[in-house]
């Protein structure tokens, strides 16, 4: 398997086309601000080499990979940004499950399930400019259910 020299760059939008962007050290999903279109955060992505590659385990970072999305190590999953270098996680031999998401491809969109908390997925709120968080997918989702499908496109 080839070893990456740096993280891959992706941009993420939810299926309602809200872009993921950073504000006050929080990852939010939104669109227009004062008539300016937000370009969206560059998301640094590396595979987690310690976990089963067939499950597409990925580690997601922001700010050039200097901070990574983590589900924490508490009793319940809490999504937060931790000041950990994405390449250290990539090159390290640890499982780093709290930083890992299984990317599930669903045609045009993908969902991201926490490796540390199975059944919990990255999601956005239907309202704009709310934090990205984790949710369990309900049996019969209501119209205002969290959005768990994302467009995941490599940066130009």
Curated annotation (Swiss-Prot):
GO terms for molecular function: cytokine activity; interleukin-1 receptor binding. Highly abundant in embryonic tissue and tissues containing epithelial cells. Disruption phenotype: In combination with transgenic IL36A exacerbates skin abnormalities (acanthosis, hyperkeratosis, presence of a mixed inflammatory cell infiltrate and increased cytokine and chemokine expression). GO terms for biological process: antifungal humoral response; inflammatory response; innate immune response; negative regulation of cytokine-mediated signaling pathway; negative regulation of interleukin-17 production; negative regulation of interleukin-6 production; negative regulation of type II interferon production. GO terms for cellular component: cytoplasm; extracellular space. It is found in: Cytoplasm; Secreted. Disulfide bonds join 9-155. Keywords: Cytokine, Cytoplasm, Disulfide bond, Immunity, Innate immunity, Secreted. Removal of N-terminal methionine is necessary for full antagonistic activity. It holds the Pfam family IL1. The keyword ATP-binding does not apply. It comes from the Eukaryota. Bioactive (processed) recombinant IL36RN inhibits effects of IL-36 when used in 100- 1000-fold molar excess. Interacts with cargo receptor TMED10; the interaction mediates the translocation from the cytoplasm into the ERGIC (endoplasmic reticulum-Golgi intermediate compartment) and thereby secretion. Inhibits the activity of interleukin-36 (IL36A,IL36B and IL36G) by binding to receptor IL1RL2/IL-36R and preventing its association with the coreceptor IL1RAP for signaling. Part of the IL-36 signaling system that is thought to be present in epithelial barriers and to take part in local inflammatory response; similar to the IL-1 system with which it shares the coreceptor. Proposed to play a role in skin inflammation. May be involved in the innate immune response to fungal pathogens. May activate an anti-inflammatory signaling pathway by recruiting SIGIRR. Belongs to the IL-1 family. This is Interleukin-36 receptor antagonist protein. It comes from Mus musculus (Mouse).
């Amino acid at each position: 398997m080839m070893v990456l020299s740096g993280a891959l760059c992706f941009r993420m939008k939810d299926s309602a086309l809200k872009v993921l962007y950073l504000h006050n050290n929080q990852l939010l999903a939104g669109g227009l601000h004062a008539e300016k279109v937000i370009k969206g955060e560059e998301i640094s992505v590396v595979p987690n080499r310690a976990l089963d590659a067939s499950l597409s385990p990925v580690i997601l970072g922001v700010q050039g990979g200097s901070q990574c999305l983590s589900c924490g190590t508490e009793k319940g999953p809490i999504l937060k940004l931790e000041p950990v270098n994405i390449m250290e996680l990539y090159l390290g031999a640890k499982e780093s499950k709290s930083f890992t998401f299984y990317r599930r491809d669903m045609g045009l969109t993908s969902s991201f399930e926490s490796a540390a908390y199975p059944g919990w997925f990255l999601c956005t709120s239907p309202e704009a400019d709310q934090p990205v968080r984790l949710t369990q997918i309900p049996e019969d989702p209501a119209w205002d259910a969290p959005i768990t499908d994302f467009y995941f496109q490599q940066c130009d």
